[in-house]
Amino acid sequence: MEQTFIMIKPDGVQRGLVGEIISRFEKKGFSLKALKFVNVDRPFAEKHYADLSAKPFFNGLVEYIVSGPVVAMVWEGKGVVATGRKLIGATNPLASEPGTIRGDFAIDIGRNVIHGSDAVDSATKEIALWFPDGVVHWQSSLHSWIYE
């Protein structure tokens, strides 16, 4: 089954959106496989966002991520990467549809509440970076009510 990496960014944590965001993924039918609440240091943030290091907004993005604690998670389910991105909404919250996490809870692109893997290969890399000891292997008793 496919897995994705989701991070609730410092603004989402500070604004008390952790429960709401987790609830949306659970209600969709995805399974939480790993979760940690952590303060990210600059070298780790730079490693996570290494693919964006040449962008003019890179330093601001890193400063934003290290400004407070984040909630790092791994979710599992059929099509979880693409569907997770749909639940999250567009990178720019002003372009996000109402009903998405960013559409409902964010305004500025620089404070967009949440990160989600953009592809299966990105998810694999991000999960390995954030959870080097692996994730919890379990199956919800609701699995057969969600999947054929």
From Swiss-Prot:
GO biological process: CTP biosynthetic process; GTP biosynthetic process; UTP biosynthetic process
Enzyme Commission number: 2.7.4.6
GO molecular function: ATP binding; metal ion binding; nucleoside diphosphate kinase activity
Pfam families listed in its UniProt record: NDK (PF00334)
Domain of life: Eukaryota
PTM remark: The N-terminus is blocked.
Enzyme class: transferase
Active site: H115
Binding site for ATP: K9, F57, R85, T91, R102, N112
Cofactor: Mg(2+)
Keywords: ATP-binding, Kinase, Magnesium, Metal-binding, Nucleotide metabolism, Nucleotide-binding, Phosphoprotein, Transferase
Reaction(s) catalysed (UniProt annotation): a 2'-deoxyribonucleoside 5'-diphosphate + ATP = a 2'-deoxyribonucleoside 5'-triphosphate + ADP; a ribonucleoside 5'-diphosphate + ATP = a ribonucleoside 5'-triphosphate + ADP
PROSITE patterns in alphabetical order: NDPK, NDPK_LIKE
Family the UniProt entry places it in: Belongs to the NDK family.
Protein role: Major role in the synthesis of nucleoside triphosphates other than ATP. The ATP gamma phosphate is transferred to the NDP beta phosphate via a ping-pong mechanism, using a phosphorylated active-site intermediate.
Name recorded for this polypeptide: Nucleoside diphosphate kinase 1
The encoding gene: NDPK1
